[in-house]
Amino acid sequence: MSHSSHYSPVDSGMVPSSSSTEDHLSPTLSASIVLPAQLNPFAKAYDIPPSSIVQLGWALLLRCHLAIPSPCWSTIDDKTMPRGSDTHALQWESLHLEEGRSISWILQRWEDPSVHWYLSSDQLPGSKSPTLTTMLFLVKEYGLFDPVTPIDPGMGTIIYFYPSDEQPRLHISWNPDVVSSGHAFHLTRSLEHALQTIFLAPSVDIRDVNLFGIWDHQQLLQWNSYCPDPVDRLVQEMFQDVVAATPEASAVAAWDGELNYRELDRLSSRLAGVLQSDFGVVSETIVALCFEKSVWAIVAMLAVVKAGGAFLHIDPQHPPARHQAMIKSTASKLFLCSEQTRDTVVRSVPDCPSLVIHREMFAAQPDHAQQDTVISSGNLGPTNAAYVVCTSGSTGTPKAIVVEHVSLCSSVTAQAKAMDITAGSRVLQYAAYTFDVSIGDIFAALTHGACICIPSNWERAHDLSGAINRLGVNQACLTSTVASLLTPVEVPKLKKLTLGGEPATQQCINMWVDKVALKNIYGPAECTVWCIIQPDVSSGIAVSNIGHAIGARAWIVHPENHDRLMPIGAVGELLIEGPLVARGYLNDPVRTNAVFLAQPPIWLASFGPPPPRSRFYKTGDLARYGPGGALLFEGRKDTQVKLRGQRIELGEVEYRLHQALSDLSPSAAVELVHPKESTAPLLCAFITWDEGIDLDLQPAKPPLSACLTPNARKRFNHTVSLLQTEMERTLPAYMIPGLCIPVHKLPLTTSGKLDRKALRYFCTQHSLAFLSTFENNNVNSPTDGATDSFAAPLETVSPAESTLAQLWAQVLGRKTDSIGRKDNFLSLGGDSLAAMRLVNRAARDAQLTLTVADVFKCPVLADQASLVRPLVQTRNLVPFELMAPGDLQIEDLVAYVAEKCGVLHDQVEDIYPCTPLQDEMMRDSLSGDRTQMGQEVILLAEDLDIPRYLSACARVFQRFPILRTRFVQHSDRLIQVVIRENLGWQRPESLTEYVEADAKEAPALNKPLTRWALTSDSTHCILTMHHSIFDGISLGHILGAIYAVYQSIPLPPDSVSFAAFLAQINEHTSGLSDDSKQFWRSYLRPSPGSGDLPLPIVDSTYRPCANRGTQRLVTFQSGVVPALQQHGLTEATLIRGAWACTLAQLQTSSSTPSDVVFGTILTGRNLHLPGVDALVAPTLTHAPIRIRMSAASNEKPASFLARVQADATAMIPFEHDGMDRIRAIDAQVRAVCDQMQTLLVIQPIPEGLTSASTSPFPGPILSGPRVEAREMRHFHWYGLLVECTLLPTNGFFVRMCYDDKLFSSEDVERLLDDYSQALHELGGGLTEGEEVHLPTERKLDTLTLPGLVAPSGAEDMV
């Protein structure tokens, strides 16, 4: 840098200081600047003190580095503070550096309080920021204050100004704990540059002040000396290299299939040939893909690029209007989809040809083994499009980013090196296909010999740790949000974790640091997935530090002018240069030209010859250079936000919102907000409304009119409902605002723009519970501390209502004050499982009696409160009490069972009856080849303390009596006996041999029903238990208890015993109560033509066994779940009603649907018994379901489903009666039960643990309850079992298990189709209010079933 005679620094060396010995002070480093003698005359010309020139220079620096128009700093003038005084003389100053004004203009008005003013401490911003860590010390005599003495740790930087007629001087001191030496050095240089600008160009406009100097240029020349060359290849060529090198290596390991590289190559080549020959796919042809997580999605992607086209992923969960907009904007001519997504594609774009991809389609296709035979077009090259990805667009239309082969190849080459993806990597593919991260996962792996591991959609949502372990994943790229849902102990084989897609959180980093090779990565989709990485994340690195560029160069430019570089350390817009920058937005030159530079910036030439075909993309992200050139992320310069990893343009949401509002509101705005005490952000829509709230943010004047009148609230709630319905048609769920607030007017800045900061600030001052009341019909608006003056007076509530509201809040995850006495439990999201939790919490925490039946009968809070009664405490049962009176003398009974079990008398801890289902299961095992044994094979962590682990298992074995339970035959019934004994371990040499032999070992009377094994190499634990002593909830508690004991976490006290449970469900008689008999006679009263599957009896001695299975993900169409809640119905009711409709269509007796009867397995935990939800024991119950279909064809779905739910509620008091005792009531009841051929099981998602495979176990579970293929043949005694596992959002996972001697796979697939159709029609009718229309009747002769057994006796039902 050249210096004129007006400004000639002579000394700017940095001087280290000695360390401070005082705890409250921090060590100091400093640098000095000698100012020119002309400083005084220059200041005198403006009639201001010389110190004002220094202050202006520092203000210009702060404005540049912090991107704020009115920086502030503190000053101390030693004229007003004697030596040795404290800092009470500290004063704060600020300067308004408005664009359009010159430096000279500012200096001339230095004393104008609208330009330069003083602030009191209460006018300072509430949060401490870099603007407040600066102090200017005005010293009257050089040497009076030592600039290297330790400084207050609250101050990051102190500038000492020493005025002098001959040689004025500055010393800059900084706290190295707050400001790095490198950053301080650049601050010093920038201050020199700012002062030089003041002296040399006082007429320059503030906006044109450029503090980028020669020192910054030299530093960037060092950091950005290298720009990677493009990888000029096709991505399929890189893939072919791997195929040639390792054809047998695993390429894809998915939940629905595995492929090695040779197989993947051949399948994708075959499909590519079809795309070329049958559909005319050539270069630049865009092919849309619509797949769930599947191996076939990978085949389809590779096939499209091999054929020369570019693929575009469409999310099957997005609304049809979104699909149509994407297809229109990209001019896609073909859809590839799966069988599951076919209906979605046909509904969304019926005019677009589609091809369903599945395994069978390849059998008849020619085998194009060599890629050369597939790609016939000679025009395909690296600059042709490889894929298109759509992101949110501010104009309401998605932006379609076109990425070329050269960009993709350049990106995956850099990504694989930076993320250490090698042939030994097993890479998790978690991200949605519409999220560009998925493309990085897939192609970085497939071009470097790694294996892509793909969990199912259900596993992604509910059992990710289990999927990671089952698939052998050792490397993953996840958002912080998702990574925080896992723990290192759950996934011990995961060795490399990269955080990306959203800013990393310190909590997530702390969890994973030192447990895995942890990296942090950044990249907009326009830069082909990733372009910046922090390769070694540690606790000492700031979460904002995203590292250095990979495959590109990163520059920081002025946010409003990319032809100006920002000084080192200053905040600016991140500009990416390199071959991985995309081509642009498809058919959108306006938006392309706005962010993709047509010409290199003018400063580029000063850094040497530009690289070939280099491209530039303005990210819109704000960043600055940190130590060593690392990039520090600082946020956005526009309205683009990220929510749960999804990129959202607020402008697009606002565009759709305005469309939906039409004439209902003149204006609206959408913002990402963080309500007070809320752990997660959400999208909030602010809608102008005549009776809306006032957003006046003056501290002394809290907002008024916060509570709408009941009438206004009702009208606004109606408007919000219309908005939600309309926006669901055009936007994906993650882009729909989760909160709507009526405002009298939108706040504006002084320049007349929307004041988004004011909107965000308003929400930070109020709780989500309070904000939610504006769109809630509940007139009892809650307060939230800061908003007491808003709330309308609460209605008088009874103590029972108040207590119940608190319990609802705990169960439903809401604030207590957001629940009103007229709210509906089911409408607030409650279901059968939530009702069970509510009942147990009421008994345990409030000593109130409430039943699940009560919850469903009276879901409104006020009505429900009228039903609660004080809890009658369960009496503690003494051992053996349930066996007396009427049995043998206890001493004789104990002697009898001790002899049978081969133990001493005092080892018999307790004896009690069996549940009806326990009896059924055990007798079924004893009568045939169905062992009913369940196995859990657990892979133990390598660093597991084995003795400690064995000790934890032993303690849990003693803690839960059910693990020490045996069955003994006593007279004509089975009883269960708890034995005091120690846990014994088997130590097999071979895991495989043991598991196979153990699975075949049948249970026996008088013997233990659990087996525990640890392989000789201590790598696997095998827990085997008979199904009569555990259920899914119990298994989760058992494994969770082992984990807790191992980690020295105290176990909660036992709240209820199995004996107490049995005392409530057993009458200790051979028959049922009169009430039970009356209920079942009425409930199962036969009607003409009623039954289950109407199939012929081929052999009365044959016992069905469900030994095969198929599965499918079923989603509810948009609006179904809210409609269910509005009608007080549950998803389980819809599932049950749809199955009834499916069975009704198979009736052959008449055109009028008949009644249907089928079996079900229920949790059995609906008793009002405190702690029953945590009971470690089998509480399942087996019962018949009867649904009268004769009137259904004339009913509206809401009425039909309400009847189904009412019947289920009425059954609750009798659900433990047991199938055998129900069948024995009389001949008519038995005849109806004999018609049951199918079993429907609805699995809820339990709180905390969904199954053993998701338990927080010290090691992953390789196989568990969900590995149904092995266990179904032992457990299912029906010919057809339908198991539906509810998902947290919008659907369920259905598995049909069947006897392959009775059903063909085609039959079952058709039944699944019929079932899906019934769900669709019922759900659609529910939202539209139509009558029930059963699917087209299917006659028996259209099925190809070989026959089905109708059991004729109780023994056949067991």
Swiss-Prot record:
Gene3D superfamilies: 3.30.300.30, ACP-like, Chloramphenicol acetyltransferase-like domain, N-terminal domain of ligase-like, Nonribosomal peptide synthetase, condensation domain. Its cofactor is pantetheine 4'-phosphate. SMART domains: PKS_PP. GO terms for molecular function: ligase activity; phosphopantetheine binding. GO terms for cellular component: cytoplasm. PROSITE patterns: AMP_BINDING, CARRIER, PHOSPHOPANTETHEINE. Keywords: Ligase, Phosphopantetheine, Phosphoprotein. It is an enzyme of class 6 (ligase). Residues 261-659 are annotated as: Adenylation. Residues 909-1322 are annotated as: Condensation. Belongs to the NRP synthetase family. This is Nonribosomal peptide synthetase rstn8. The lineage of its organism: Eukaryota, Fungi, Dikarya, Ascomycota, Pezizomycotina.
